[in-house]
Amino acid sequence: MVMNPLKNLFLILTFCLSVFGFAQEKQKITIEYAGIAASDPEIEDGALVFLRDESQQVHFIHKGVNMWCDKAIYYEDQDYIEAFSNVNMKQGDSINMVAKYVEYSGKTELAFAQGDVILTEPQSVLTTDKLYFDRTRQLAYYNTNGEVVRDSSGTITSQIGRYYMNAKKYQFTKDVVLVNPDYTLNTDRLDFFPDNGHAYLYGPSTIVGETSEVYCERGFYDTNNDIGYFQRNAKIDYESRTVEGDSLFFDRNRSFASATNNITVTDTINNSIVRGHYAEVWRDKDSLFITKRALAITVQEKDSVYLHADTLMVTGKEDNRITRAFYNARLYKSDLAGKADSIHVNHQTGLTQFINLDRFSSTDAFAIARKPVLWNLDNQMTGDTIHLISDVKTEKLDSLKVFNNAFLVSKDTISEDGYNQIKGQRLIGLFRENELYNVDIIKNAETIRYMRNDKNELIGIQKSKSGSINIQIVEKAIDEVRFINQIDGNIFPESEFPKSGRRLRGFDWRGEERPISVEDFFKDDPPLILPKIKGLEDYIPPEEFTNEDLEKRIEEAGKATPKKINKAARNVPKKSTSKPSKHKLMPFDASKKQ
């Protein structure tokens, strides 16, 4: 480059007068300061070269943008500038961009920055190697990988990114990763608002922390407060417990999650599954609350156990877990069923308690129907409280205890209205291979029994009283009865035994209540009405950076110099060849799902 110091002043004055003359026609780039100005015959189109001096950098201004650099080449006829070395571009008080090299067109208001590009706004810092900045749309764009840092949120990286300055919104696509000290977020597409730290996730997404992992295909996450809302195949993994549902809420700070509609909670250690339509999970407390057709399933090798109630609560660590079923609780497995107001299961000891609430007094006519009841094979057992003990290792039934008002009933195999009945204060039963084989009725024992011979012919009806009774059961039928401290007893011909006396006091056959399948649990439940979940807003694919408006501005910029290469068309990103995403979220109508 040939510099003629005598021409410097003349060139600057000429440049300023030229700009002033066009100012009324269309505002062009203006020079605010240059240490040295010269022409260079090696530069095409007779462009002017501006250099800094020892006091300050070259300074240009255009429509509210200030730009400083060490060297600038200005193509006056195309109102186009190239800035080199320590370039700083500032828009207003909020946007600042630095780079090694910047091109800027005063006609299209498009800037291209390259080399250690850093764009700063009040809440975040964007770093990339190449950045396009359309001032007309107030849109910055990169497609060669970029990084955005927001102190309280973390660092976001992606292959492609946009920053909408008016909306104060980032839009990231392809290999999007948000790294925070407490978690890492991966997603296909992410909309991020630096002012409030709100992030919107689109497509398969994960948020992985030390103690939890979230998956969804549509979600919202507040990076300021560490709370989130997730939909579309959403699930949360808490180490040994997984929560799935139509809609999930997540609070990292409280280790809390809630789920709405079509919920499944899986315990991988205890091989259990809990289902319902509203749930709350407290990880640190190892607590699960679930309601709306709540169903707990304990998966066993040969036969699963099902527990249903209005409300289920599961508490305790994996090795000391307790399941509580409240309000109209029912239990079912292939050879056993039970019903009570409340059922408690201790998974460590194998104790299952069938409990009545205190509000049901013995004088309440409804209390009898609400007494806990247990069915095993053909036997029905009732009492004020029932304890069922299982062997936690073999998963087989071990023993049974009925406290207060114990009553054992089995239907006679032949007569239509005959029932074998045994009652007493307490009952203790023993199981072998999940079948009841020994029963002891303790204190104030009474019995009515239909006696039959080997041909199954009725011999008579036995009625007796004793201190206690021991019963041996073989092949599901009473084989032997032993009366201990018998007080009274006799066998009556059927014709001499009045029907009015064939029921012991407190008799209540409840065979119609016995569930014979899991589906029977829900027959008496009120109609299930699920809330309609409000879907998050649909994903709106970003428009091309090089859109029709920008193309028109570039074309218009070249009309003034038709015989020259249109510099405004330099370094404009090519249009994407990929098709817009087909992912579209419609509002949930959970009422259509059961």
Q: Locations of the language-model features?
A:
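N-terminal amphipathic/hydrophobic interface segments
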Residues: 24-594
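Bacterial N-terminal signal peptides
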Residues: 10-18
